[in-house]
From Swiss-Prot:
Pfam families: Trm112p. This is UPF0434 protein HCH_02705. GO terms for cellular component: cytosol. Belongs to the UPF0434 family. InterPro entries: Trm112-like (IPR005651). HAMAP family: UPF0434. It comes from the Bacteria.
Length: 60
């Protein structure tokens, strides 16, 4: 994930910061407890495509 791109992207729901999860290829918003997938190097910033974080993921 390009650091410049990550710096300008925000959660489409709450406009909060996103963290890059390299292992899962996701952009994570801990505020909303959502993880947005990265497919073929492109972040999919659609709420309906996001998965809900587990309790452990939210706390960790």
């Amino acid at each position: 994930m390009d650091k410049k791109l990550l710096a300008i992207l925000a959660c489409p729901v709450c406009k909060g910061d996103l963290k890059y999860d390299r292992e899962k290829q996701e952009l994570v918003c801990k505020n909303d407890g959502m993880a947005f997938p990265i497919r073929d190097g492109i972040p999919v910033m659609l709420e309906k495509e996001a998965r809900t974080l587990t309790t452990d993921e939210r706390l960790g």
